[in-house]
Swiss-Prot record:
InterPro entries registered for this protein in UniProt: YaaA
Protein name: UPF0246 protein EUBREC_1226
A GO term from the CC aspect: cytosol
Family: Belongs to the UPF0246 family.
GO biological process: response to hydroperoxide
Name of one Pfam family that matches: H2O2_YaaD
Length: 249
C-alpha cells in the first residue's frame, strides 16, 4: 500500500538532524529540469513561478548555487507546508519513520516521486507550471507514467491524500487491477458539504501521522480516523472514496 501526498512551496534546509538515506529515484530527470530552468531569464522564471519580486529573487539566488547531491535534507523534513506541520515528522519515533519510508510517497514537479528520507534541496516548481522540456509540452507529459510506476506496488493499493494538481499524475495511468482510494475532508456550509483548503491540508498531514502511529496496512482501518473533529461518513463514501466530515461545535 502506498500513500500519495502533494509537496509544499515552503522548504527549509536542515542538515543537522537526520541524514538522507538516498537520492531521489529520478535524480537524472531532475538534473534535466534544473538545466532547463537555469536557461531561463529572471523575468521568464518569475512568470513560471507566479510569484512576487522578492520570492523570485530568493529562488533565482538559490538556482545559482543549487546542488542536487550535497547538503541535502530528508524530503519529509524539508517541506514546511500545513500538511507537513500536522504530520509533525520531527517528533516521529523510529517505527513511524519506518512506516512512512515504506508507505508514503511525495509527488513533486521537480523530483517526480520522493520517499520521505530521500535527500532534497529547496526548489520552487509546481506541476501546472508552463514548462516545456524536449518534446514535452508540460510537466505532466515530461513525467509521463513514471510517477505511477514508482508508486504502484504489489498490493496495487494507493491512498490518495494529494491535491488534484498532483493526483492527476497517477490517475491517468490507473488500471482495473488497481485499488485507488481518494480521501475527502469536508464540512457543512449551509446545506451542503464543502472542502476548505486549510482544514483539508491539516487533515491530510494528521491522517499520515494517524496511519504511521497505528501501523495501518488495511485501508478499512483508515475509517477509524477521528482527529481534528473529523468523523467517517459511511453514507457518503464508496470503495474508491472515503469521506470524512469535520463536525463544527
Amino acid at each position: 500500500m502506498k500513500i500519495i501526498l502533494s509537496p509544499a512551496k515552503k522548504m527549509i534546509v536542515d542538515t543537522d538532524n537526520l541524514v538522507p538515506v538516498e537520492l531521489p529515484v529520478y535524480i537524472d530527470k531532475t538534473a534535466e529540469v534544473l538545466n532547463w530552468i537555469k536557461s531561463k531569464s529572471k523575468e521568464e522564471l518569475k512568470a513560471i513561478w507566479k510569484c512576487n519580486d522578492k520570492i523570485a529573487e530568493q529562488n533565482f539566488n538559490r538556482l545559482e548555487n543549487m546542488d542536487l547531491y550535497n547538503r541535502l535534507t530528508p524530503a519529509v523534513l524539508a517541506y514546511e507546508g500545513i500538511a507537513f506541520q500536522y504530520m509533525a515528522p520531527s517528533v516521529f519515533e523510529n517505527s513511524q519513520f519506518e512506516y512512512v519510508q515504506n508507505h508514503l510517497r511525495i509527488l513533486s514537479a521537480f523530483y517526480g516521486v520522493l520517499k520521505p528520507m530521500d535527500g532534497v534541496t529547496p526548489y520552487r516548481l509546481e506541476m501546472q507550471a508552463k514548462v516545456e522540456i524536449g518534446d514535452a509540452k508540460n510537466l505532466y507529459e515530461y513525467w509521463n507514467d513514471m510517477l505511477y510506476r514508482s508508486v504502484i506496488d504489489e498490493s496495487r493499493i494507493i491512498i490518495n491524500l494529494a491535491s488534484k494538481e498532483y493526483s492527476k499524475c497517477i490517475e491517468k495511468y490507473l488500471t482495473p487491477k488497481d485499488k485507488y482510494i481518494t480521501i475527502s475532508f469536508c464540512e457543512q456550509a449551509g446545506n451542503k458539504l464543502v472542502t476548505k483548503g486549510t482544514y483539508a491540508k491539516m487533515a491530510r498531514g494528521e491522517m499520515v501521522r494517524f496511519m504511521a502511529e497505528n501501523d495501518i496496512e488495511n485501508p478499512d482501518d483508515i475509517k477509524k480516523f477521528d482527529r481534528l473533529g473529523y468523523i467517517f461518513r459511511s453514507d457518503l463514501s464508496s470503495d474508491s472514496k472515503y469521506v470524512f466530515e469535520r463536525k463544527i461545535a
